């Protein structure tokens, strides 16, 4: 194969891809340095490159409006060897294993002798003499349960849906740097919002690699759209709404999103993409970040209310554009169908994104859930203290378990990578500000991390420690030994004193929304999907469940005589419990049937107030004022 067109040239079929000649376009610098990746040689500024040994790949996704139970996919390959492996990517965090829903796989070629064989759940072998073939399959969407839909999962409705991403495409194993084209066959009234590169055909898009392909899902349907620019870089907000959507002030929503982008650009000095797409979905929860887009649940009622929660989640996911998509843990490498190794660095990826979700909104003057940074820190410290696992489990250990398949990995404790990492960031930010007399902050750490670890090599915990030490000119090894690699409680007052504050902690009876004593629900049911039933996760051995002799991994049989069938049904039973109730639990452990009596006794929760230390110095007061303003 001599070449293929640049992304600016349309491609309806693979034949057109192969027939066109290669166009070489040298990228000229824009008026600003925004959105430009560092280049090491002038040859790297070529818009599209192809090796003669690479296959030509074209995908087609077809949505039939008369059957929205799934969609059809075809992948056309030319120029590959006689035997090819096709696979579906395993996501390092949210591996939903959608290969389970691939149906009716079949193959076509000019010889009529091609064969496709499933080798594993997410792996297929293709034998096609001549190396050219078309594989077709259907992705049968799973039935929705619980009345809620995750914003990152594919769906179809009469007015739109979400397709593509890791849930949809088979890729060629060993050819992850091969470019491809994707053509969408959709109802005529539907439009497309995706981070994939557009072509002259409005329904065809270009992906320079498998990673870009699977990290660029496509929101399709009757979309509302708004656009803005930051540093001359275009941003696109697409919204898919339900039929009963509540009207909201779209100008205010888009303005808030734009302010976040401006603050992030100001922090890092530039934007790392050529265009960004916000894929907002009504009737969905949660979100998932991508290198140049985000899939985010955005209920119209929350948008109408000006919800701080929506902006908080958006800011968190958007910050992942830098912190995870580019500044990535060393364990995160190129795509693979194999489950990737668990990362020890998610405390940084998730925790720092939580830290900046709050900070960027404050800098932008956007709604937040607490009036001041001090109040926000009070809430975070109280949450940390309320769960002993946060101090008994190291941030690195919790990172490894964060997206694991088995909640039993942490025993009868639970902990939050997001919370641990946020508080580690908060304390290190205070350390840096103190050591540099307010001249530097965590902002300087993020910029240096972006410069060093957004390329071929990801970061380790030692790298983070080294960068912080360089920025502050101080030693932080004892802190990392104790709270990142080790499992000791963070001594908050040691760092709060830099700004003339201390944490006053009191323990009070836990109350529900009605003001009455709350039931002790420091345990929850879960399922592993292995058909073994519902298990119990104890999050605190000092809870009523732990005191009754229950342990994480116990298989639940009945609660108060009600047979346990599903996780959702179990949650329904637990929500009916009140403080003072006595609960009879039938369970199985090690193949032995057992029973336990759980007494829903009252329990205490921590409340934290930041108080001023005695006789704070002028330097402490000045540093506090700078910190409270969220100054860089």
Residue ranges and their predicted role:
Residues 35-66:
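N-terminal, polar/Ser/Thr-rich
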Residues 63-65, 93-153:
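A surface-exposed beta-strand-loop module
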Residues 69-99, 170-187:
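Surface-exposed beta-strand/loop patches in extracellular or lumenal glycoproteins
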Residues 92, 138-220:
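Extended, low-hydrophobicity, Ser/Thr/Pro/Gly-biased non-transmembrane segments
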Residues 75, 225-346:
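Juxtacatalytic substrate-recognition/specificity segment
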Residues 357, 367-632:
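C-terminal recognition in membrane/secretory proteostasis and scaffolding
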Residues 291-302, 326-327, 338-390:
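Post-HExxH zinc-binding segment in Zn-dependent metallohydrolases
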Residues 97-107, 140, 167, 177-197, ...:
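Zn2+-dependent metallopeptidase catalytic core
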């Amino acid at each position: 194969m001599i070449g293929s067109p640049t992304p600016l040239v349309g491609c309806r079929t693979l034949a057109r891809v192969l027939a066109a000649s290669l166009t070489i376009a040298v990228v000229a610098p824009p008026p600003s340095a925004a959105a430009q990746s560092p280049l090491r040689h002038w040859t790297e500024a070529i818009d599209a490159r192809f090796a003669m040994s690479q296959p030509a790949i074209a995908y087609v996704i077809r949505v039939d409006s008369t059957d929205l139970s799934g969609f059809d996919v075809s992948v056309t390959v030319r120029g590959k060897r006689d035997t090819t492996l096709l696979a579906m990517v395993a996501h390092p965090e949210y591996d939903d294993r959608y290969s389970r829903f691939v149906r009716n796989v079949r193959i076509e070629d000019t010889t009529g002798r091609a064969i496709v064989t499933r080798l594993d759940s997410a792996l297929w072998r293709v034998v096609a003499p001549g190396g050219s073939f078309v594989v077709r399959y259907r992705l049968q969407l799973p039935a929705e349960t619980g009345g809620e839909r995750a914003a990152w999962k594919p769906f179809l409705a009469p007015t739109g849906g979400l397709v593509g991403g890791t849930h949809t495409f088979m890729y060629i194993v060993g050819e992850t740097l091969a470019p491809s084209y994707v053509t969408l066959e959709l109802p005529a009234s539907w439009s497309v919002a995706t981070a994939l590169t557009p072509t002259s055909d409005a329904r065809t898009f270009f992906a320079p690699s498998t990673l870009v392909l699977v990290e660029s899902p496509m929101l399709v349907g009757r979309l509302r759209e708004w656009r803005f620019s930051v540093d001359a870089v275009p941003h696109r907000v697409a919204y898919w709404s339900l039929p009963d959507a509540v009207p909201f002030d779209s100008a205010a929503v888009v303005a808030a999103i734009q302010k976040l982008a401006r603050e992030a650009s100001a922090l890092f000095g530039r934007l790392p993409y050529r265009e960004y797409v916000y894929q907002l979905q009504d009737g969905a929860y949660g979100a998932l970040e991508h290198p140049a887009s985000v899939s985010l649940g955005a209920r119209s009622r929350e948008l109408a209310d000006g919800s701080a929660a929506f902006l908080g989640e958006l800011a968190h996911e958007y910050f992942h554009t830098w912190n995870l998509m580019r500044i990535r843990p060393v364990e995160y490498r190129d795509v693979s169908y194999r489950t990737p190794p668990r990362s020890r660095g998610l405390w940084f990826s998730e925790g720092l994104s939580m830290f900046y979700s709050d900070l960027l909104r404050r800098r932008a003057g956007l709604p937040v859930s607490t009036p001041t940074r001090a109040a926000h820190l009070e809430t975070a410290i109280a949450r940390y203290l309320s769960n002993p696992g946060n101090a008994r489990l190291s941030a690195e250990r919790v990172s490894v378990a964060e997206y694991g398949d088995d909640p039993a990995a942490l025993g009868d404790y639970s902990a939050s990578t997001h919370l641990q990492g946020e508080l580690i960031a908060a304390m290190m930010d205070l350390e840096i500000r103190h050591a540099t007399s307010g001249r530097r902050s965590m902002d300087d750490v993020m910029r240096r991390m972006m410069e060093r670890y957004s390329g071929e090599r990801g970061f380790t915990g030692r790298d983070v420690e080294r960068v912080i030490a360089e920025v502050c000119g101080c030693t932080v090894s004892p802190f990392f030994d104790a709270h990142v690699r080790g499992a000791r409680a963070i001594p908050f007052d040691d760092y709060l004193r830099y700004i003339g504050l201390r944490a006053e902690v009191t323990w009070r009876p836990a109350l529900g929304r009605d003001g009455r004593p709350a039931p002790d629900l420091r345990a929850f049911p879960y399922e592993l999907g292995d058909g073994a039933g519902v298990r119990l996760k104890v999050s605190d051995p000092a809870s009523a469940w732990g005191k009754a002799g229950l342990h994480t991994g116990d298989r639940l049989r009945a609660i108060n005589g009600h047979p346990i069938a599903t996780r959702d049904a179990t949650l329904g039973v637990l929500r009916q419990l009140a403080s003072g109730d006595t609960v009879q639990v039938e369970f199985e452990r090690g193949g032995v049937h057992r029973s336990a009596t759980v007494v829903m006794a009252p329990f205490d929760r921590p409340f934290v107030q930041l108080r001023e230390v005695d006789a704070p110095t002028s330097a402490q007061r000045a540093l506090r004022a700078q910190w409270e303003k969220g100054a860089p």
